[in-house]
Each structure stands twice: as C-alpha cells, then as structure tokens.
Amino acid sequence: MDGCFLAPLLLYLMRLLLSPDIMKLPIDRQVYDSLLEQMDILDISSATIRQSGAIAKALETQSGAEFLHLEMGIPGLPPMRVGIEAEKQALDSGVASQYPNMYGIPKLKEQASRFLKAYLDVDVAPLGCIPTVGSMQGSFSTFLLCSHLVEGRDTILFIDPGFPVQRTQTKILGIPSDSFDIYDFRGDKLGPELERHLQGGRIAAIIYSSPNNPAWFNLTEDELRTIGELATKYDTIVIEDLAYMCMDFRKPLGKPFEPPFQPTIAQYTDNYIIMMSGSKMFSYAGQRIAIIAISDALYHREYPLLPVWYKMSRLGDAYVFAVLYAVSSGATHSAQYALAEMLRAAADGELDFVTSAAEYARRAKISKKMFLDNGFHIVYSMDGDEPVSDGFFYTVGYKDLSSGELMAELIRYGMATIALSTTGSRQNGVRVCVSQLNRPEQFDLLEERLRLFAADHPL
C-alpha cells in the first residue's frame, strides 16, 4: 500500500484504540476560530489566563470532550483543616459584623513575623506584617505605593517571565514598566543586565517570583545577592513574590527554625517587601488572604513624595492608612484568623505544608515526561548547572511553533495552557500547571492527546 494512504489509516486506527473523547479531537479549526471571534479575542497569544479557561470550557461544552485544564493555578489540594476550623470559630464569635483593623489582627501579625523567622530566618517586626486580600491586592497596592515615593522614579521593573496579571495591574494604574527575560541572564550575566536598567534612575521597584511562575526556576543565593546589592546601590525597592515558598523540592526545605531556609532577598538588602500568600502554601485561595511583609528599615523610612500624595511621610503608615484603606478597608476579618492559625501551626511544626505541596512535584514529574516523550522540550530547563525542580508549573515548547501557535494547537487537542508571551517571556512555548491533574485517568488522557498531537505534528 502506498505510504501516503498508510499514514492516515494508521492514525485512524490509533484513534479507535484510544478513549472515546479522542474521536472528538482535534476541534475543527473553523469552530475554534468562530469561538474566538465571538469572545472578541483577536490574538490567542495575548489571551489572559481566565480567557484561556473560558475558551476551553466553551469548546468542552460544544465538543462533549473533557478538557485538561493546565492553564490556571488553582490549588489542587484540600484547604488546611486547621484554617477552616479557626475561621469558623471566628465567624461564630461575631467578627463578620466588625470591620477589621487596617493593620491586621494582632495574632496574625505576630504569627506572620514568627513564620518568616521560622522559614526564611528573617526578622520582620509584627508591625510590618500586613494582611491583604490575596497577593493580587498586595502587588497592586505596592506598585501604586512605590511609584509615589520619589519624583521621577515611577517605573516597575519585571524580571521576566512572571505572573501576567501583575503587568496588567501596572497598565491599569498607569504606571510605567520595564522588563527583561532572565533566560539569557542567569548567574554572572544577571548583574550587568539589571544594572543597565537601573542606571537610568527611573526604577521604583523590582519584582520577581522564586520559585518562578511560570517557569519554576529558583534564583540562586548569588543571584539574590546581586539583586540585593544593586537595589541598595540604586535605592530601589525589591518586591519578592514568595507565593510558592519552600517548594523547591530538590532541597530539604520546610523544617521550621532549621536550615536550609527559603532563599530570600531579605538577606541582602533592607529595601524589600515580601509577598506571602495563603493560596498555594495552605490551599486557601478562595478566602483571598495574604501577607505583605515590609522590612523594618523600609517601614519607618520617610519619602519626599508621600506627604504630597497621602499627607503622611512614613512608608508603612502611607501604605496602611492611605493605599490599602482606599482599595479594601481591610482584609476579610475571619480569613485573618484562619491564616494566623495556619502560620502558627506551621511554625510549631504541626502543619507540614511543604510535604503536602510535594504532590505537585509528583504530578509534574509524570506529566513532564509525557511531554518530553512526545517531542516537546522544556523551555526554562536549568538552574545554573542543575535541572529546575518539579513543581506547580513548568514550561514546554514544540519545534519552532510560536507561543500563540502552540497554545492554539494544544487547546484544539483538549489541553488548555497559557502562552509564554503573556508572561513577558521572549521564548516560544506555553506554561503548564499541574494542579488540576487530580485524577489518575487525567494522566491517561494527557498521554493520549500528546501522542495524537505528535502524530499530527511530526518533528
């Protein structure tokens, strides 16, 4: 039989041997294009995380095939019971009728300070540990604050790739931003590139995440030292997003008050603000609760523009009584009790959130191999001389497909992701989140679909 007829026949037979859903895939391109037009999405490569999920759910409904939702970082583990019980008790005591203290409840502030000492070996006074409505509000409010400190210094520098919504926040606020992709600037190359951006004198704050969303690399101690020293030299604030604290599963992190500790910028400069979320550490995302930890030195520092904007000169006071007050009037009262108790239990060694979160590494290891076995490659693959840790996210590319092209093709095969272009990355690929791979049969579906994708897109 002629080879040109044999290949389609083999592909058809392969589909028959796989799950019934495979017969419904890939989604017809006209159906897919029509849906994008209906949703007013002109370019799939710029679709937000929520838009990607909405596209997948609409196609899921139309096709009847179960989609694999690899696009959104929803916790895939149950919320910590100790937090639920503490919040229920707080609600039963009547806190729902009371506005929360803008500074945060005393117990939360004290336990946040203690938790930072236990897991980062960092001393931050309870005064500077301030609850926010998730880290999303934390970044939004700190961007605004940092842009109002010094005349002419109003730009946020993103060390990319990063969380796409944070860049959207600067656009909404009308704050200028700058960025560079760390892909080509790891190790000794980081300092010169970072200094090139700082030399202009307009950078108000630097933001990054470590472990990184989306690539899951971890900045090394040397890289953190470089950032810290340059932040001090150029008097710039570093906003460190530790949403995935202690989740570098290559290291024995997570033993309270014992080394090794979570690497942090706080060891190398006083100009830091740490964002610490309950969403992933404790799977408490629905209650929207986080901590902004402002260094003692920074909290008490006075800035020339603050009285102009907020009628007060001290950074910490302006943050609490002007910025946060204006955007939320305090974080949810009962959720503060939940977070306080989870932080206490973790610092006391009663709640091992790191071992619980290691489930994500197991899912990543299994699914990552499936991608690699079917011709994909890991985009951000190395931390210095060792492979990146397995964890909540990883990044994959396929041949020379652009980020948008790969995202579009994967979604037609029932796999929703987000394009790396939305994260500030200059590399081609997509972000994969493993949190919603909750059932063993989903891994079977993933393997089937990747095999089909590879058969339809030969290398």
Per-segment meaning from a language model:
Residues 333-336, 340, 353-368, 378-397:
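Conserved glycine-rich beta-strand-loop-beta hairpin in the small C-terminal domain of fold type I
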